[in-house]
C-alpha cells in the first residue's frame, strides 16, 4: 500500500515538474475538452466554459474547443459572444457546414435574418443537400416575405426528398397566401397521396377548398379530421360548423358546436354559430341567450348586436330592436368579431 502511495507521489511530482512540450499541451487540451463536453452534457455550463477556456489557453485554434464554447455560450443565452466564438472557429475552418448552420441560427435568434441567410447559403454551398440548412433557410425567407425565393427553396428540397410531406404542406401554405389556390391544392393532394391521414394537409385542404367555394368538399376534410382522426382543433371545428350552416346541415352543426364548447366554453364564434342555429330552427329565445353570451364575452361584436336587433324586430319589440341597432352602429369601429 505504501509502495503504491510513493509511486503515485513520484508520478505526481513528475507531472508537476515536467518540461512542457507541444505534445503535452495538446494532450492536456484534449483532456480539458473531454471534461468540458461532460459538463456541457450534464448542463453545467459554467464548468464547461472553464474547461474549454483552459483548453484554448493551451491550443488557441482547437476547433472542437471553440465549437463547444460556442454551444455553451448559446445555451447560456450569450448570443453575441457565441457568434463571435463560432466566427473565430470559421476563421480557422470555414468548410464545415454545421458551424455555418449554428451561426445562422444564432443570427436568426437575434433577429438578423439577412445574416442568417448568408450563413445558410454558405452551408449549402459546401453541402448542397444539407436538409437542416434548407429548413432554416425557408424559415428566414418566410419571415422576410421573400415568397418567390422561398418557393424555389421548397422546389429544390423536393427534388432531393420528393416524399417529404411537411414540405409539400408548407409549399401549399405559401401558394395559398399568394392566391395560387389550384397550385396549392395540387401540393396538398400530393401530400395526402403520400400520407392520407396527415392532419396538417387535411386541415389546410379544408381551408383552401372553403376559400374556393367548394363547401361540400371542404366539409369532408374537416369531418375526416374531427370524426375519423379524432382531431379536436378548435379552428377545424369552427370551420366545420360554418360550412354546415352554409350547407343547411343543421343537425350535425349542433353536434359540432357542442364538441367545440366542451373544449372551450368561452369561444365567441361557436356561441354566435349556436345563436344562428337556434334562430334558423325558430328557437328565438334560445338564440337570444346565445347572442347575449357572445356580447358578454365580446361587447363590440356587431353581428351579435344586429342578430339580437333582428330577433327583437321579428318579435315586435321595436324599442329593443332600435336599441341594439343603435349599439351596432356605435360599435362599428370597435368590432373584433368580423
From Swiss-Prot:
TPR repeats lie at residues 27-62, 63-96, 97-130, 131-164, 165-198, 199-232, 268-301, 302-335. Keywords: Repeat, TPR repeat. The keyword Cell membrane does not apply. Pfam families: TPR_11, TPR_12, TPR_16, TPR_8. InterPro entries: TPR-like_helical_dom_sf, TPR_rpt, Ycf3/AcsC/BcsC/TPR_MFPF. PROSITE patterns: TPR, TPR_REGION. This is TPR repeat-containing protein MJ0941.
